[in-house]
């Protein structure tokens, strides 16, 4: 008579007669003793699912700086000139966003909606600077992405989830910090749907990208490849919950004012004087932007619906450009003045010269961005010569230096001072 072979636990080696229960699997067995042992280990070690949930819950446990809207705006004022309406609106939106995170941290029953921000306005009006300044004030990780480089999954280009990777890198791979950071996506208007019937051709960098951005902007757990690039099987991922990340997107939205003017023209019959005035005033028109205008421009309704704060950054005036040159904490004239002071040379800008620089920047139609280029071109040769010339005491930039390309006025030191 053949003796029956006893089944044994594949983990501890106990036979079926030495244990109370032995559970069979494909070619393996596990006893009740080992099950209890493994259960105890799992109770002490968070599972991947638990870690995924806990990241968003534990993120706010680190110090969270929540300033009042007035405090936020006051800090922005130190770096950003003009844009009073935009700064007030964004200050409130950011305050509510981080108040929402704090409410989640305190397990409050009432939850607040997410305060993502859409900034409209011409190039050089301060959209990016506002976002950068916010991140600096709040001491949170910050990254900038260019919407024109993004493509939907399956096409050559950059996956939208790589934006989250950049934020994670800015946070030194601290997931908890990254999950309450700020992402600014520039040139968002460039992914507007360009045709009314998108089924004719595949819009790789338009509607498809808007669809791809929807989930991470609204809030999802994104699987991020640590080294970026495309995803592939058997790859390790870092899970980042985007629910508490503040998304700010910006774009020039060229000709959006015409779409708004057309709508106002249809709805303000009998008020032609007011309408005609608005048509000639782009900033006033953009201040009246509605969701339907952005949809007509080419943004899909689902995407626009993710932004409950839409605000216009107005084109900078001549006086504001001059103020940008001299007033902010990091004003560019202050920077160059300090550079020359390190060479023991005094750099002087006459008021008329500052206005001439501002006028030149305005003509370039790139707003404040042109100011730095104008000054760099103006002072480059001087910065090359001055370190080797101890005879120069001061340099004066006059209006003619800008308008007629005349050389700056250079004042020499006295021989006694050089000696």
Swiss-Prot record:
HAMAP family: ClpX (MF_00175). It comes from the Bacteria. GO terms for molecular function: ATP binding; ATP hydrolysis activity; ATP-dependent protein folding chaperone; protein dimerization activity; unfolded protein binding; zinc ion binding. Transmembrane segments: none annotated. Belongs to the ClpX chaperone family. Residues 1-50 form the ClpX-type ZB domain. ATP-dependent specificity component of the Clp protease. It directs the protease to specific substrates. Can perform chaperone functions in the absence of ClpP. ATP binds at residues 122-129. Keywords: ATP-binding, Chaperone, Metal-binding, Nucleotide-binding, Zinc. Coiled coil: none annotated. The gene is clpX. The keyword Cytoplasm does not apply. This is ATP-dependent Clp protease ATP-binding subunit ClpX.
């Amino acid at each position: 008579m053949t003796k029956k072979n006893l089944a044994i636990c594949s983990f501890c080696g106990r036979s079926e007669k030495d244990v109370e229960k032995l559970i069979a699997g494909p070619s393996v067995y596990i006893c009740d003793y080992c099950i209890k042992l493994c259960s105890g280990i799992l109770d002490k070690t968070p599972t991947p699912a638990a870690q995924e949930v806990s990241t968003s819950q534990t993120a706010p446990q680190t110090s969270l700086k929540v300033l009042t809207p007035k405090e936020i705006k006051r800090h922005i004022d130190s770096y950003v000139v003009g844009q009073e309406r935009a700064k007030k609106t964004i200050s409130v939106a950011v305050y509510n966003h981080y108040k929402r995170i704090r409410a989640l941290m305190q397990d409050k029953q009432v939850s607040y909606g997410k305060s993502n921000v859409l900034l409209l306005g011409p190039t050089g009006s301060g959209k990016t600077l506002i976002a950068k300044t916010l991140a600096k004030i709040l001491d949170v990780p910050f990254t900038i992405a260019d919407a024109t480089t993004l493509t939907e999954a399956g096409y050559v280009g950059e996956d939208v989830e790589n934006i989250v990777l950049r934020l994670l890198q800015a946070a030194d791979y601290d997931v908890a910090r990254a999950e309450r950071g700020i992402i600014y996506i520039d040139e968002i208007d460039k992914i507007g749907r360009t045709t009314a019937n998108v089924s004719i051709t595949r819009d790789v960098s338009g509607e498809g990208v808007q669809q791809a951005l929807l989930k991470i902007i609204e809030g999802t757990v994104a699987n991020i490849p640590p080294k970026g690039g495309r995803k592939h099987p058997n790859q390790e991922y870092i899970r980042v919950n985007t629910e508490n990340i503040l998304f700010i997107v910006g774009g020039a939205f060229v000709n959006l004012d015409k779409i708004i003017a057309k709508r106002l023209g249809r709805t303000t019959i009998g008020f032609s004087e007011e309408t005609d005035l608005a048509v000639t005033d782009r900033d006033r028109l953009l201040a009246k932007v509605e969701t339907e205008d952005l949809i007509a421009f080419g943004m899909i309704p689902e995407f626009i619906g993710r932004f409950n704060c839409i605000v216009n950054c107005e084109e900078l005036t001549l006086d504001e450009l001059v103020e940008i040159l001299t007033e902010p904490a990091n004003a560019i004239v202050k920077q160059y003045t300090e550079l020359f002071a390190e060479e023991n040379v005094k750099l002087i800008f006459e008021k008329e010269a500052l206005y001439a620089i501002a006028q030149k920047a305005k003509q370039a139609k790139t707003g404040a961005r042109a100011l730095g280029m104008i000054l760099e071109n103006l002072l480059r040769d001087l910065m090359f010569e001055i370190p080797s010339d101890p005879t120069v005491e001061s340099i004066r930039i006059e209006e003619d230096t800008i308008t007629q390309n005349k050389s700056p006025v250079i004042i020499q030191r006295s021989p006694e001072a050089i000696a």
